[in-house]
Regions:
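Conserved pre-motif I regulatory segment
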Residues: 2-53, 62-66
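Generic recognition of stable, solvent-exposed alpha-helical segments in well-folded globular domains
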Residues: 28-35, 60-63, 87, 91, ...
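Conserved Walker A/P-loop ATP-binding site and its immediately adjacent core
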Residues: 80-105, 119-131
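Amphipathic alpha-helical transducer elements in NTP-driven molecular machines
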Residues: 62, 117-120
Length: 131
């Protein structure tokens, strides 16, 4: 599979997630969220850093998780790289791990896109532990 084929497939997956799968589970379509996810995917595929700004309620978390999933499912480089996400709060870190990823995994597995749940780990600095 060549790089351009994988780029196209990854972008189609984002559209499928936001236009078909998530709405089937009661979530609203948000054009800004879809555009944001496509921009993030482009940066991931090109190996660039993306600094994206979006208002409250746009759906940033699902936007970057969908982009990361699409980038991993359809890699454009020779080497698979981990995707690192930095959040604004510990509460959001926990929500990504316990709410967002499980729902996205369930939706993608039900559609046959994934065969096993998405995996993630939380890395915390020493200031988060009693020593």
């Amino acid at each position: 599979m060549n790089t351009n084929d994988n780029r196209l497939k990854a972008h189609k997956l984002i559209d499928h997630i936001f236009q078909d799968l998530l709405p089937a589970h009661g979530m609203a379509q948000r054009p800004e969220q879809i555009q944001l996810s496509h921009r993030m995917l482009d940066a991931m595929q090109d190996g660039r850093i993306a600094l994206c700004d979006a208002g409250t309620g746009i759906g940033k978390t699902y936007a970057y998780l969908a982009a990361a999933t699409a980038a991993s499912a359809f890699p454009t480089g020779q080497i698979a790289r981990p995707i690192i996400i930095s959040t604004s709060s510990i509460a959001l870190q926990n929500a990504v791990l316990t709410e967002y990823l499980p729902l996205l995994s369930c939706v993608l597995m039900a559609d046959g896109i994934l065969t096993k749940p998405l995996k993630a780990v939380i890395r915390k600095g020493k200031s988060h532990y009693v020593c």
